[in-house]
């Protein structure tokens, strides 16, 4: 039984890492520069912190990787509680920075890996 749990956990970890890598590629193609990946503090983790140097905007990105819609779509995956947590984490990260930003944005990127294994990326900007 333990081997099954470990195998499932590793699969989820690998799936999450793949989703984050695809999200980074997507953000880079949009012209954003990634500042941090998996920034952690005692209150949680921010998947990706990126910036748009042209507009001096910092973007905090939550990545949701799914193999199907069994848990609902992307909007259902980001609850008001999750948005509050992301805001708190963003504030903590900003408090430790010397740079001042003209704008701050929280985005969610959904990566859906279907049976064909061709990932579909959905990017919701400014969710909170």
Curated annotation (Swiss-Prot):
| Species lineage | Bacteria, Bacillati, Actinomycetota, Actinomycetes, Mycobacteriales
Organism of derivation: Mycobacterium avium (strain 104)
Quote the SUPFAM superfamilies the UniProt record gives.
Answer: Restriction endonuclease-like
Domain of life of the native organism: Bacteria
Q: Name one Pfam family in it.
A: UPF0102
Q: Which GO terms describe its molecular function?
A: nucleic acid binding
Family classification: Belongs to the UPF0102 family.
Name under which the protein is recorded: UPF0102 protein MAV_3752
């Amino acid at each position: 039984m333990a081997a099954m749990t470990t195998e499932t956990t590793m699969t989820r970890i690998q799936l999450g890492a793949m989703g984050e890598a695809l999200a980074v590629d997507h953000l880079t193609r949009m012209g954003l520069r990634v500042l941090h990946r998996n920034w952690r503090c005692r209150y949680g983790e921010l998947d990706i912190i990126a910036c748009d140097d042209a507009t001096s905007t910092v973007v905090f990105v939550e990545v949701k990787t799914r193999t199907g819609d069994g848990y609902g779509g992307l909007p259902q995956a980001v609850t008001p509680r999750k948005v509050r947590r992301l805001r708190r984490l963003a504030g903590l990260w900003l408090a430790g920075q010397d740079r001042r930003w003209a704008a701050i944005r929280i985005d969610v990127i959904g990566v859906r890996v279907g049976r064909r294994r061709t990932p579909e990326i959905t990017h919701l900007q400014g969710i909170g």
